[in-house]
From Swiss-Prot:
Keywords: Disulfide bond, Hormone, Metal-binding, Secreted, Signal, Zinc. The gene is GH. This is Somatotropin. Residues 1-25 form the signal peptide. The keyword Signal applies. Its main location: secreted. The keyword Signal applies. Disulfide bonds join C77-C188, C205-C213.
Length: 215
């Protein structure tokens, strides 16, 4: 029975990931499945961003400069200006609505920069999957709004009130300064998507009493 249930859940997630309608393809999903779907989508998005970051680093950043660039360009990200938790203790102290609100803020802060990257670098080998990254951003954003409505008795409020956006990526990849700026932005993007993934895992774990809620 457990094996059959697990297979069904995996099939559901695969269908959702492939469906162009995203979360709306399954409007009657249980809350548990909505969280499962959101977590897997966040994991997938985080991995895609991490792969893009890795490919960019290998292509444009000399090995002897990589650690220095990480420290000088990605130590500070705009997301650090919002009161989103940065460690597991603070994360567990936040309500689910707060964590969803922070997640929405992080997702929405990248919408415009990634949309521009998609237009400018769509044919670039390193940024070849950036169109899918943008689609995943929008889809997960939609899914988090659905979760908020489920948790807040159907109310639709402006939870993305902590509005900010990142700088545009530099289109001049021949410029060392431009390459370094993009490297720092990708580092922040990866860091922010890891936060979103972690917040969703914590919410799912504590709501459905999974064995280990430390991430």
């Amino acid at each position: 029975m457990a094996s059959g249930l697990g297979s069904s859940l995996v099939l559901l997630v695969v269908i959702c990931l492939q469906s162009p309608q995203g979360f709306n393809a399954f409007p009657q999903m249980s809350l548990s499945n909505l969280f499962t779907n959101a977590v897997i989508r966040a994991q997938h998005l985080h991995q895609m961003v991490a792969d893009t970051y890795r490919d960019y680093e290998r292509t444009y950043i000399p090995e002897d400069q990589r650690f220095s660039n990480k420290h000088s360009y990605s130590v500070y990200c705009y997301s650090e200006t919002i009161p989103a938790p940065t460690d597991k203790d603070n994360t567990h102290q936040k309500s689910d609505i707060d964590l969803l609100r922070f997640s929405l803020t992080l997702l929405q802060s990248w919408m415009t920069p990634i949309q521009i990257v998609n237009r400018v670098f769509g044919n670039n080998q390193v940024f070849g999957n950036i169109d899918r990254v943008y689609d995943r951003l929008r889809d997960l954003d939609e899914g988090l709004h659905i979760l908020i409505r489920e948790l807040d008795d159907g109310n639709v409020r402006n939870y993305g009130v902590l509005t900010f956006t990142y700088d545009k990526f530099d289109v001049n990849l021949r410029s060392e300064e431009g390459r370094a700026k993009n490297y720092g932005l990708l580092s922040c993007f990866k860091k922010d998507m890891h936060k979103v993934e972690t917040y969703l895992k914590v919410m799912k774990c504590r709501r459905f009493v999974e064995s280990n809620c430390t991430f």
